[in-house]
Regions:
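N-terminal Rossmann NAD(P)H-binding glycine-rich loop of SDR-like oxidoreductase domains
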Residues: 5-25
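NAD(P)H-binding glycine-rich loop region in Rossmannoid oxidoreductase-like domains
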Residues: 46-84, 88, 92, 112
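Catalytic helix-loop patch of NAD(P)-dependent Rossmann-fold dehydrogenases
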Residues: 115-164, 185-187
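Glycine-rich Rossmann NAD(P)(H)-binding loop
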Residues: 166, 188-193, 221-228, 239-242, ...
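Mid/C-terminal beta-alpha module of Rossmann-like enzyme folds, strongest
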Residues: 209-277, 294, 314-317, 327-329
Length: 330
């Protein structure tokens, strides 16, 4: 297309894929991030989001991938990174006259301690976020909704990708493997809860479509592979591909959820507020089904996954085998 783009969080797993995908499709991309050594080759902006607000870097499209993502932490840290940070990105996009801002949010905003199937984009209850990360993403989305009403600013598109996986994943799969190695993965409710995953290549595709499709402006989109599966079957497939034995513990979900609440309370008053071994959000995530309806993305963006869950798990296993000492631990 010949347009320019700036991608925040470009030193991260998703951000790096977005940079490479946009460049492969003709965009002149500036990769923005705090760690120069981790940024993709090509034009870069090294600095935090506060510095970006005043940066002299042209962009027709701004993609905001940067975020502090953790089930535990202080509200002030999440607020600065994810709410104030988003405001700084919006400020930058307005100042350089960007036509569109694509914001990568989180389907964590749908989280609840119960099964939720085929969730639509409007089915959000902002009154009861399960942790500070989710609260911060809700605030960031609210900020952008208000901004999208300003005809002088950039058009805003919000994406909510679920369970991003693929070769080089530094978060989702490595966390599971660490638990598996230490004690075995807990199977709550028998591991029957349905899990939606998304190949990182498919998220990058969705970002590009969100940047280009005229009818996407002012809209939020769920993004997944559209292939939900039971947690235990995904775990078995992953470990088999890695050549590891399936080690798990069958535990009563209600008991583990209660213990997690106690651990959160204790860690919350300890010096330094250390992260508890398990949180209620994590327990809820691996206990309950949460699947997303992606019909809006299909109908409006023309989104269709191009990489399957099986292919993503296989590519992770291949990268794992090629890495000294095991997995790509990020």
């Amino acid at each position: 297309m010949g347009e320019s783009a700036l991608v925040t969080g470009a030193s991260g797993f998703l951000g790096g894929h977005v940079v490479r995908d946009l460049r492969a499709h003709g965009y002149a991309v500036t990769a923005a991030g705090r760690r120069a050594e981790a940024l993709p080759d090509g034009p870069t902006f090294v600095g935090d989001l506060d510095a970006l607000a005043g940066a002299d870097v042209a962009a027709d499209v701004v993609v905001h991938c940067a975020a502090l993502s953790s089930p535990w932490g202080r509200w002030s840290e999440f607020e600065h990174a994810n709410v104030t940070g988003t405001a700084r990105v919006l400020e930058y996009a307005r100042r350089v006259g960007a036509r569109r801002l694509v914001h990568v949010s989180s389907p964590g905003i749908y989280a609840a301690p119960r099964d939720r199937l085929a969730i639509r984009e409007h089915e959000v209850d902002p009154s009861r976020p399960m942790n500070h990360y989710i609260r911060s993403k809700l605030h960031a989305e609210a900020l952008l909704r208000a901004a999208s009403a300003d005809p002088t600013g950039p058009e805003v598109v919000v994406l909510r990708p679920r369970g991003i996986i693929g070769a080089g994943d530094p978060g989702l799969v490595p966390r599971l493997l660490r638990v598996h190695e230490r004690v075995g993965v807990p199977l709550l409710h028998g591991g029957r809860g349905l899990v939606d995953l998304t190949a990182v290549e498919n998220v990058a595709l969705a970002v590009r479509l969100a940047a280009e499709v005229p009818g996407a402006a002012g809209t939020a989109f769920n993004i997944t592979n559209g292939d939900p599966r039971p947690f235990v079957s995904l775990l078995d497939q992953l470990l088999t591909g890695l050549g590891l034995p399936l080690r798990h513990r069958r535990l009563p979900a209600e008991l583990v959820y209660g213990v997690a609440g106690v651990l959160e309370a204790v860690c919350g008053v300890l010096p330094g507020r250390p992260e508890p071994p398990v949180t209620r959000y994590t327990v809820s995530t691996i206990t309950h089904s949460q699947t997303l309806d992606i019909s809006r993305a299909r109908e409006v963006l023309g989104y269709e996954p191009v990489v399957t869950v099986d292919e993503s798990l296989a590519s992770y296993a291949e990268a794992y085998s090629a890495t000294p000492g095991g997995a790509a631990r990020g």
